[in-house]
Amino acid sequence: MSNSISFDFLIKVLRKVFLFQNLPDHLVKQLSESITTQEFEAGKAIIEKGDEGNAMFVIISGKVKIHDGNEVVAEINEGNFFGEMALLDGEPRSMSVTAIEHTVVAIINRNDFFNVLNDFPAISKNIITQLTRHLRAQNDVLIAQWRSREKELNDLVEKRTEELANKNSELMLVLDNLKLSQQQLVQQEKLASLGQLTAGIAHEIKNPLNFVNNFSQLSLELLEEFKELTDETERAEILTDLKNNLEKINNHGKRADSIVKNMLNHSRTRNDDKQLADLNKMSDEFLHLAYHGMFANNPDFSCYMKTNFAEKLPKVNVFSQDISRVLLNLFNNAMYAVNKRKKLGVMGYEPSVSVTTSTVNNCVLIEVEDNGTGIPETMKDKIFEPFFTTKPSGEGTGLGLSLSYDIITQSHKGKLSVESVVGQYTKFIIQIPV
Amino acid sequence: MKVLIVDDELDVEQLYRQRFRKEIKAGELEMMFAFSATDAMSVLAELAPMDIVLVLSDINMPGLTGFDLLKFTKEKYPHLNVVMVSAYGDADNMNRASSLGASGFLVKPIDFTLLKEKIFSI
Ligand SMILES: [Mg+2]
């Protein structure tokens, strides 16, 4: 027992403690005799979590907090006690206790406490009541903490949900933009291929138009001659010529017409319906358009063009504009490849692009083959990917083949495949179900 | 006088034959046709070049081009006149033709009066 605190005062204090309220006088006295007191400055630890629980404490003066790290479970002052739990169950301290202000505590040792308990078992009731109170209080604190945590958590979830919703609408916007740019890219690719076509178209129209002009001019002159002639044989000759010329005019007129139709078809934004198309005719026309387009852009360009068209090729229901883009793209690539190989300057190289049609298993096959540079094995998987291009920047959009692939496999439920040997050939095979 | 006309368009034959009907009938002119540069080369190899006075060649033809033919002809038969014919009358093509030794350049559609003059001035 500390010298500064009187025995009587201690008895008074213990009496005030709920736990010892009903304790007989002699036992309170006995307890008081074994008690020691200790002083703690503000901020000093009285109990540390994990300490051995070998005593309980009664606050004689001052104020302490019961806490677990930063979490304060309770603040108690004069007349209250703490540390009885560990005393009962003998477990290490589950909480720390620290003085908030200058505090004096009375320390009741485990053995002394148990002696009192033996002599006066009725105290157990107080202990249980007290424990229940403590537990309840602690429980309330925990529940309150849990509630506030729950609220925090709910708030957090709400905040996150809102953030996600915002992110989501942002992403939707990005997606919309992407779709828009994709459409623009597709349009750009169309325009690029149309640009390439223009030269080919101009040439392909100019040739038949020249014939139309030449033959009609010629026919006018023949008619003049005819009027003056008297010799029947000569007149008959001229009539034959005239008839032939009119046929030529008609043929070349149709040829020009078909090219213009193709061009309009090619540049139109979208075909609404599939139409029955003669793929031989389309292949032939676009092979020549591509050829003249290449030539107009590279005056040195030339290649042999071979066509092997199946005689009774069934007409196929297609989006003809889309198919024409695929054909043009494949022919352009083929011609680009042969031109590239030709530029290597190997003697005796004859650049050649061929197109072959056939029917296999209820499918129309169009094979576009060139004897150009070929495609390395490692690139074969990538060539159908968007933006993949081997051309120098500015020369290709890298969309041609990926669009072609989509057109054949998606819009026409067909197949587009490639075979190639580097330095020998490349063959694209379009397969469209009839 | 024998002229070899080279063009990948088959109908040029009918056109030229009618255009030069009178000259052909009168025996002033004989026309031969080839529909590719390779064809033309074998025609030239077969007929002694002295038999032919003029080659009139298209430039843009599948396979070997008119320029290839021009080069070949000028190397093998330097004295043979070659006149190029093309829908593309740009300076590049014209310069190229003259640097390879062409004796003329006609832009399609052909002005036949001009062509006649050209042929008979040889
Ligand atoms: Mg031509």
Predicted region positions:
Chain B
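A Lys-centered signature of the CheY-like receiver
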Residues: 8, 108
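Receiver (REC) domain active-site loop signature in two-component systems and cognate sites
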Residues: 61
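Two-component/phosphorelay signaling modules centered on CheY-like receiver
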Residues: 10-33
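Acidic catalytic/metal-coordinating carboxylates
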Residues: 36-39, 65-68
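Alpha4 helix (beta4-alpha4-beta5 surface) of REC/receiver domains from two-component response regulators
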Residues: 68, 89-104, 114-117
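Active-site beta3 strand of CheY-like receiver
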Residues: 49-56
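Receiver (REC) domain switch/active-site region of two-component response regulators
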Residues: 111, 120
